[in-house]
Amino acid sequence: VIPFAVNVVQYPVPSGKRCFMLGQAIRKAVESYDEDLNVHIWGTGGMSHQLQGARAGLINREWDNAWLDQMINDPVGCADTPHIDYVREAGSEGIELVMWLIARGAMSDIVDGKVQGPAPTVKHRFYHVPASNTAVGHLILENN
């Protein structure tokens, strides 16, 4: 297990594009090994939520689910989403979603920053808003 800590608390936080590119670099490093490896890359972070301020309690189910769709089918567009859109639509803590783009950037359909193959297979998708008032999503994708 090799954990990567990505700062999304102290500004400036990395852009989605930068996280997406990190995923591509990780895949390139993994592919450089002479032997087959069993590799799992996990992106983590809460979905829409805001814990403080006038918008405390914000949850945007529609935006979260549209973001999951885009993450699967248009990851380059997802990576190009500006920070202000995350904050506006998903709350101040919604910026955590950029960390998911590390995992998505490492998928085999991404070549030189572009989608050049079939989208990954969705093995599992889940969305829920628990009592903690932080939207939770799970997305398990498998290379084709």
Language model features: what each stretch is:
Residues G45-R55:
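Divalent-metal (often Zn2+) His-rich catalytic cores of metallo-beta-lactamase-fold enzymes
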Residues F4, L37-G45:
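Beta-strand elements within well-structured catalytic alpha/beta cores of enzymes
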Residues V9, Q24-V39:
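Non-transmembrane, aqueous-exposed alpha-helical and coiled segments at domain scale
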Residues V1-M21, S32, G53-N144:
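Flexible, D/E/H-enriched segments
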